[in-house]
Amino acid sequence: VQVQNPWRRAGAKFGTAGRLVIMTTVAALLVAAVTVPLVGLAGIATRDVANTFNTLPVGELGAAPVRSVVYDAEGHVLTYLYPNAIYRVPVDYDQIAPVMRNAIVAIEDDGFYNEGALDPRGTMRALVNNTGGGSLQGASTLAQQYVKNVRVLQAGTNQSAVDAAIYPDLQRKVQDLRVAVDVEHQMTQQQLLASYLNVAYFDNNAWGIEVASQVYFSKPASALTLAEAALLAGLVQSPTQYDPFTEEAAATARRNTVLTRMWQLHYVTKAAAEAAEKQPLDLKRSGVPGSGCTAMTALASSVGAGFFCDYVEHVLELDYPSIWKEINTTGGLAIRTTLNLQDQRAADEGVNYVEPNHNGYFNPGQNADTEVLLTPGTGAVQAIAIDRKYGQDDIDYAVNSEYGGGAGVQTGSSSKLFTLVTALEQGYPFGHTIKVSAPSTAGPYTNCHGGYVNPATFNDSEGPTTGTEVWQMNQATVDSINVYFVNLEKEVGLCNVVKTAVKMGMTRADGRSLLAPDPSLGRNRFSADNLPGFTLGEVNVAPMSMAAAYASVAAGGMYCSPQAITGIAVISTGRQLPVQKQDCYRDMSTGVAAAASYILQGVLTVPGATAYGRAISHHAAAKTGTADNGYYAAFAGYTPTLAGYVSVFNPTNPT
């Protein structure tokens, strides 16, 4: 039962029509007060001013910003992204405890259920005071407060916009009132009350009742008790002044004021209010969660998904600029990614494993170990793992620099894939022989412009160290014979090898084409078709690019660019937003892909091969790569359903 004051009873006698007349009349006077001095009001027809109020432009209030959610492929939450760093979790009317709904109405707008967007008594008082030159006053109903808070939330970190939203001049009151009236026409009372509680500020970075319930009591808004609800309702008038963490006495007194008002309005009995007043505050503080990849869920953190998350953020920023803007302004989006938690956990464990008898060979603590896993035929990024703690080192060494990566890595002999595929495309048989010696001088070569490329001399760590030997292509691949491949590169054409790599999705680590000049120091200032050592991994690339290239062989010659996002939806409506189409194309014939896979299986199965003994129960193929006496190492491997690339390198000196 609610106690009605005389003003509300007067309005109630006329029913809805009577309340509308009162509201419009007072609104008309309020508009007049903005435009003319009080002494001139007598000469203005109320009807004319009312018409002016009714024709004021409403404008589009828009939605209050809300968090976006990033999911893995199976729907597990990875992290939340908060617009303007504001953590807000809207809840429905039924998810807010009735005592909380009653408490906020009792203390902030006891005429909520009768007067609507306008408080006539308060507005008339403000009208007389403001036009008479006194300090600015204003009557703010829940509807008006809702409008103001939405505007503050939308302003975010723009202080001038925040000031414009809360500056208490009479003109702003009129504007807010006009929008508030429109809001009331669009919402039911239940919707408006829930909406207000979802945008109210409760101090300590707690926007909305659900977050406030968690921050102060570590419970959902649906579970609030009478005493807890009264404390939170009392906060909104002056959140800092009544902060229970720092101002316990003031907060307690304010809570008790709310309880008194609740029993006066018959929301609770006097006995219940007095019992609640005797209770201690009993706070159970919880912090507001952080935003983004440094504040992932426990599940995502446990599998080391920080660098995958970072890649997703960069993809959103670069490839979905309008979506990224929406995430950072209004939010409310659900982003479905390709992350596979099982694969991510396995990759994370792999890169953080330290060989017990390494004897310093792999330079632990200085070298970085990265692993990328992709799905052949789709390009879905299953995992990105780096042996670094995300947040302490935010460089995602697995990806191109434009997506948050570094300067790329040496690939060593894993780049022999491109020469092998080129030879197979030109019809070279598995048993194609080349007589080689070590050291061996190969060349001259011809670049893609028909230019002359000087011969170069190469040594070999796996093949002959002295004398001359004859090697067949398949055996030279599994044994990774450098001097064979630089000569094979000469035979099939250096330009053709580089073009094969480009066709298989390869770029430099900064995203530029391999055929474009590189302005960096040393030999890398030339395009890749001027580098005889290209087949030995002379150009720095991102591990993800190598994983995608090998995945195309696993997919039977179908290249698919890496894809980390499969769906984006508006949480409130479920409406699906467009995502980039899968970029897949044929980069080699199925026959060439099958032939390459057959040869690369031998890396795992042929005795004496570089990865012999590492075979698994599935059909699998692989290629190893090393540089600088093993201080840089790479391993590419794939099955029909999964392709991966592992790289160990020194990030302070990747070349």
Question: Where is each model-derived feature located?
Answer:
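N-terminal type II signal-anchor transmembrane helix
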Residues: V1-V70
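Peptidoglycan glycan-strand catalytic modules in the bacterial/periplasmic cell-wall system
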Residues: P65-T269, K389, V478-N482, E489-G493, ...
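Short, well-structured active-site flanking segments
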Residues: Y113-T123, W207-I209, K270-A272, L424-C448, ...
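Conserved catalytic neighborhood of penicillin-recognizing serine enzymes
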Residues: G132-G156, S291-A300, Y428-V497, L531-F534, ...
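Glycine-rich, acidic and aromatic/proline-enriched surface loops and short helix-turn segments
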Residues: Q145-A155, N198-N205, S222, L226-S238, ...
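Non-catalytic structural connector segments
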Residues: T269-R336, R345, V351-E355, Y361-N367
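A penicillin-recognizing enzyme superfamily signal
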Residues: L333, T337-N363, E371-L373, A383-D387, ...
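Mid-domain, small-residue-enriched loop/turn segments at the edges of structured enzyme/sensor domains
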Residues: H449-V453, F458, G493-A548
